[in-house]
From Swiss-Prot:
Origin superkingdom: Bacteria
Reactions catalysed, as given in the entry: L-lysyl-[protein] + 3 S-adenosyl-L-methionine = N(6),N(6),N(6)-trimethyl-L-lysyl-[protein] + 3 S-adenosyl-L-homocysteine + 3 H(+)
Name the UniProt record assigns to this protein: Ribosomal protein L11 methyltransferase
S-adenosyl-L-methionine among keywords: yes
GO process terms (BP): methylation
Organism of origin: Helicobacter pylori (strain Shi470)
Family the UniProt entry places it in: Belongs to the methyltransferase superfamily. PrmA family.
Residues annotated as binding S-adenosyl-L-methionine: 177, 198, 220, 264
UniProt subcellular location: Cytoplasm
EC number, as in UniProt: 2.1.1.-
Keywords on record: Cytoplasm, Methyltransferase, S-adenosyl-L-methionine, Transferase
Length: 329
């Protein structure tokens, strides 16, 4: 009797990883796992370490089409994205990723590339294996954990955030989310009104509510993100009050002014939303999801309307805490 099989895909995206992760999510509706050699070593997964370290990776580059389908080693084999499927997606997903690369090149006027590996394995409880790989993480004052890990008794309820990272929406493990939470943790938000732009999993909105904001608005252009935010509100026993709103759409649907705005989104969207943030922000604006290579272009746009109070960086990811200049209405 043949054993049931499943397929495991490994991806390395040298540029705009979050854009590629969102594409994978929208295309496959499957869980993604951000992993690294360090995490595989922690779980003593010698088989997978050997596979990704010794295999020749497939490579695709929009700026060097002659290299298409050549096999080579990624220059930085450290962090990667894992996708698991009960179906072989090589003939559908990989061509779709290549087409996505080409569309990014056309829209952003820059070259894009990615590395990938795949293998098929005898079926096992890989969902359970995935769960075991997702560990709690401490982000400043917040202890972030999935529902299958219990909160330690010494951690206060207001400092605990429960997120099941089944979708690529933000679980506290990504650098851009963690440094954004660090900047939020230092603020006195009691009786303030707040806006979370690109709410994703709702992790930043939950942090805002736990820090005492009196009114919260959150928005995302992805309907799945809105559903995920509402689900995680319920998971964390966050009650939406009459003045709280979770909206499917962008900032154009938001009215009023906010004491604090947070946006953990890609740099190109941050740049396009400058005038909207000027319209909506009364005081503090926290921006994250900015790759170091895009930082100067973001600062050039925001210089006229905002003062940089603090800048934090982890690996290639940067977050900014900005103060709106009083001369700007």
């Amino acid at each position: 009797m043949l054993k049931p099989m499943y397929y495991e895909f490994f991806f390395i995206f040298p540029k705009e990883q979050e854009l590629f992760e969102s594409f994978l999510l929208d295309t496959t509706h499957l869980a993604l796992e951000e992993s690294s050699l360090e995490s595989l070593k922690a779980f003593d997964d010698k088989e997978t370490i050997e596979f990704i370290s010794q295999s020749s990776w497939h490579y695709f580059a929009t700026h060097d089409p002659l290299k298409e389908n050549l096999k080579e080693k990624p220059p930085h084999l450290k962090n990667f994205v894992i996708l698991r499927s009960q179906k072989d997606l090589n003939d559908s997903l990989i061509p779709a990723l290549k087409a996505f690369c080409l569309s990014l090149q056309q829209n952003l006027q820059s070259g894009f590339d990615f590395f990938y590996l795949s293998r098929n394995l005898a079926s096992k409880d890989w969902l359970e294996a995935y769960k075991q790989a997702i560990l709690p993480v401490q982000c400043a004052k917040f202890y972030i954990h999935p529902s299958w890990h219990q909160k330690p008794s010494h951690v206060a309820t207001d400092d605990s955030i429960m997120i099941d990272p089944a979708l690529a929406f933000g679980s506290g493990h990504h650098e851009s989310t963690s440094i954004c939470l660090e900047l939020l943790s230092n603020l006195d938000l009691k009786r303030k009104n707040a806006l979370d732009v690109g709410c994703g999993s709702g992790i930043l909105s939950i942090a805002l509510k736990k820090q005492g904001v009196s009114a919260l608005s959150a928005c995302d252009t992805d309907s799945l993100a809105v559903e995920e935010t509402l689900k995680n509100f319920s998971l964390n026993q966050i009650t939406l009050l009459a003045q709280d709103k979770v909206i499917h759409g962008s900032t154009q649907k938001i009215e009023g002014r906010f004491d604090i705005i947070v946006a953990n989104i890609v740099a190109d969207v941050i740049k396009s939303l400058y005038s909207e943030f000027v319209r909506l922000c009364n005081h503090t604006l926290i921006l994250s999801g900015i790759l170091e290579t895009h930082l100067n272009s973001v600062l050039q746009i925001y210089y006229n309307g905002f003062e940089v109070l603090e800048q934090r960086q982890r690996n290639e990811w940067v977050a900014l805490k900005l103060l709106k200049k009083q001369s700007i209405n």
